[in-house]
Design a protein with these regions (language model features):
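A conserved acidic beta->alpha catalytic loop
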Residues: 24, 36-48, 59
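Residue at a conserved register position within TPR or TPR-like alpha-solenoid repeats
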Residues: 215, 253, 287, 332, ...
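Short aromatic/hydrophobic "clamp" motif used to bind/position activated sugar donors
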Residues: 79
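Single-residue signature of alpha-solenoid repeat helices
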Residues: 190, 224, 262, 296, ...
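Short beta-strand/loop segment that forms part of the nucleotide-sugar
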Residues: 9, 25, 30-38, 55, ...
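Catalytic-site signature of metal-activated, phosphate-bearing donor transferases
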Residues: 64-71, 88-223
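N-proximal low-complexity "stem/linker" segments adjacent to membrane-targeting elements
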Residues: 1-24
Length: 532
């Protein structure tokens, strides 16, 4: 490329992801330095095929030492640091913008913040964003610090306090996807490294916070609070992970059954972090817990009005936008303000058609109020994903609204094939007994279904509770209002406040099954984001 960038990496057994990473930067960097800490797969061969200089070293449990070994081998004036499970995002203007940025850099500019977007869940249906210094000058005075959760920004700021600027570049991180975490056993590895570091270096605040975050990740909130509380009293907002510390402390109190103490933490620090959308959403969740819908709506109004601060805080996707709108809809529901709840869910889906929390709440609301046009309105405005259409089927059948299925027959063709019983049940609800029997007959022949089960399903489908009017359904809905329970584990900025909405619309069995997907990025704030 000719603008002088060395890519520096440390790897171990990354044959499954290294090729993807290196392909994305082949037009960005001029040399590749790979420090291998003991791979037994094809990692080093893949690196050499891409022209990398491969340095083998023994792993001693210190990430910074391995990182600094790669920096020492770099020969170009600028250094880009990536992990094998990350991909540099290419855009049509990226190459030109990168060349312009580095060529125009003043002498007092030593590095740039890069947005790291970490995908979560099974396939990245949610994500967290973080700003990390990954592009910086090649200078022997600049070095990584920290045995675990290593960072380089402190080293740069010691030379120039304002020496790291924001850039418009992005890296996608795949390391927090469920399968990757399982395969790498990251939790056990991190706990071992943290304990070793504490034995070697003593009770450093960064290490204590890292340990607290690991306890938090394991849902051991009492253990986490024993570390979080003293740290919150000791540390100042200037430290790179203080906002995470506040959020995790509040959530830990809530999870052990002390919502009042959780709310006290949020109220104490919200004036300091008045643009931290995730914290403001947590305030709303806590107020909803107490049945104070109007106060919750005020928190959400503030979250929605806060400017985007992806460069300041680690934040979960949808904070201040569709997540806040979904929580807003839930607050309106609990206040029996149905039209406003419908409008909030619709607005959330316009912003994010894949928001299953908003969609499922809207389906339930439409069923309870007898307003199917709400579903048609959304379907006409946005392109809903297949999972959304699939969720419509059980809701329509449970609400005895087979007309919903007929209205959206074209969009439901695929989901109905995936749920073959649904068509028979819908026909039974429509009174088409012969057609329903024909649709359900193949299931009667399946031994696993039992001889009478399809007909029991058919009787359920055609039954209708006496007097099941919209008013009766709404009264029942008010007796069991949705509780926005947050996920039990954390992301980069701590647990996901508005993922409460995501969980509230799901059956308990599904929530239990889904718990392993709640992601970790627990100590990413230790990588020193920009203070402004």
């Amino acid at each position: 490329m000719g603008i002088g960038i060395s890519l520096c990496m440390i790897v171990k057994d990354e044959a499954g992801s290294l090729q993807r990473c290196l392909n994305a930067v082949r037009d960005v960097v001029d040399e590749i330095i790979v420090v291998d800490t003991g791979s037994v797969d094809d990692t080093t061969e893949i690196a050499r095929l891409h022209g990398a200089v491969v340095i083998r070293t023994e792993w001693n449990g210190n990430f910074s030492e391995a990182r600094n070994l790669s920096l020492a081998a770099a020969t170009k004036p600028w250094i880009l640091v990536l992990d094998a499970d990350e991909v540099w995002v290419q855009t049509p203007q990226m190459k030109t913008e990168l060349m312009r940025l580095l060529a125009a850099s003043r002498d007092d500019v030593w590095g740039y913040w890069i947005q790291v977007t970490s995908l979560l869940g099974v396939s990245g249906e949610e994500h967290v964003t973080d700003a990390v210094c990954r592009l910086f000058r090649n200078d022997p005075r600049i070095a990584f610090q920290g045995r675990i959760h290593e960072e380089i920004a402190s080293s740069i700021m010691a030379l120039a306090p304002q020496g790291v600027l924001h850039s418009g570049f992005e890296v996608i991180h795949y390391g927090y996807l469920e399968q990757v975490i399982t395969d790498k056993n990251k939790g056990a590895r991190n706990m071992q490294l943290i304990r070793f570091a504490l034995n070697q270096e003593g009770d450093q605040p960064e290490l204590l916070y890292a340990l607290a975050a690991e306890w938090f990740q394991q849902a051991k909130y009492d253990e986490a609070l024993r570390l979080l509380q003293p740290l919150l009293a000791q540390l100042k907002p200037e430290c790179g992970y203080h906002s995470d510390l506040v959020l995790k402390t509040a959530y830990a109190w809530r999870e052990i059954g002390s919502p009042e103490r959780a709310l006290a933490v949020v109220e104490a620090w919200a004036p300091v972090y008045e643009d931290f959308r995730d914290l403001l959403e947590l305030g709303a969740v806590l107020e909803l817990d107490q049945g104070r819908e109007d106060v919750a709506l005020n928190w959400l109004k503030q979250a929605k009005s806060a400017a985007s601060t992806a460069s300041r805080y680690t934040s979960v996707s949808g904070a201040g936008t569709y997540r806040s709108l979904t929580l807003e809809g839930m607050a309106y529901e609990r206040a029996s303000r149905w039209a406003e709840a419908e409008a909030a869910y619709t607005a959330a889906l316009v912003l994010q058609p894949g928001s299953m929390a908003a969609w499922q709440r809207l389906l339930l609301l439409a069923a309870a109020t007898g307003r199917p046009h709400a579903i048609a309105s959304v379907a006409a405005r946005v392109s809903l994903p297949p999972a959304a259409w699939q969720a419509l089927i059980p809701t329509a059948l449970a609400a005895h609204r087979p007309d919903w299925l007929l209205r959206h027959a074209a969009a439901l063709a695929g989901p109905l094939r995936a749920q073959p019983l649904a068509a028979g049940l819908a026909l039974a609800q429509l009174g088409e007994d012969a057609a329903a029997r024909a649709a359900l007959q193949p299931w009667a022949a399946q031994r696993s279904m039992g001889q009478r089960r399809p007909w029991r399903c058919g009787r359920w489908a055609t039954s209708s509770p006496a007097g099941a009017t919209p008013e009766r359904r709404l009264a029942s809905r008010q007796r069991c209002p949705p509780r926005p329970t947050p996920p039990r584990r954390c992301c980069c900025a701590g647990p996901r406040p508005a993922a409460a909405a995501w969980r509230a619309a799901r059956p308990a069995a599904q929530r239990q099954a889904a718990r392993p997907r709640l992601r970790r990025a627990a100590c990413s704030r230790l990588r020193k984001r920009s203070p402004a």
